[in-house]
Amino acid sequence: MKKLKFFWILFFVSVATFGNNVGKLEVKSDPPDEFTTLLEFLEGKVDFIKGNFPIIPADEVKKNLKNEAYHIIDIRSDSWFEYGHIKNAANIPAEELLNYFRTKINPADFEKIILVCYSGQSAAYYTGLLRIAGYDNVYSMKWGMSSWREDFADSWLKNTKTSFEEKLETVQNSKPASGTPPQLNTGKLAGEEILNERLQTLFAVPYNDFILNSEDIFKNPEGYFIVNYGKTEDYDLGHIPGAMLYTEGSSLLRNTDLLTLPKDKKVALYTTTGQEAAYLVAYLNVLGYDTGNIAYGENAFMNDLLKKNGRDAFSPKQINLFPVIE
């Protein structure tokens, strides 16, 4: 009888222990997905998503040509660089920038590292990637070489237009509800490791792959998720049909409207000049969104309206007569 009682006591203790273990297994949570891990790693480190774009004017670069704390990197083609470039500029292909920063220079030796291109847009995109990589002293030169001298200004002179001003709308388009984010599959667990994989991937892709033409957007606005990143008063003046306002400085944060962006549709993003947008395209593409920059921004389709309202419109006034090395 005593043996029987002992058996039942042992049985119930075993069942209770097993039950407790099962309960512990059931509450064990899965690790966060790569998107969440990367986003948590980046937010707070990337200042330009709050509207603080590191864009500097050409005259600041000109004034600091003899300043060894300023390092100029020209990412234009070899032929354009040979035709004329800023004194002491290094000609580095865009796809080699990350390696250049990691192995060829000590970025901390410089107060400012300035990226220069044709229009300021591709330089802004790669400056964005480098800022995301942790290099907080990198800047892009506003308007690119178009603002340095007239024979480099065709990029902007040929692309500032008013073609679609009559097709703008003023209706306020509502954002969708928050959805699920893109899925990243780098195979890494830590935010820094995931970021490194994303940067390696994106530096290998030419910036041209992210350029969208405003004419194509106006012809088929339904084919894109159109984001006008700016201020309410500017949005109300007129925007691309179907465009939704994402407020400058706040709308692309995790706790606001970031997750209203679609994971399965092309995001066509634009700002006033396309240079600010290029920074945002870099950030969103790192996170896995399929994002393109409407080239030259609002200057490509409403340049006169920008001028009338005192906004950031390109004109010959932005072109200087600064010296180059030929």
Language model region names:
Residues 60-68, 216-220:
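A short acidic-Thr-Gly-centered motif at the start of a beta-strand
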Residues 71, 112-114, 225, 266:
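Structural motif
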Residues 61, 71-76, 89-92, 224-229, ...:
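Short hydrophobic beta-strand that contains or immediately precedes a catalytic carboxylate
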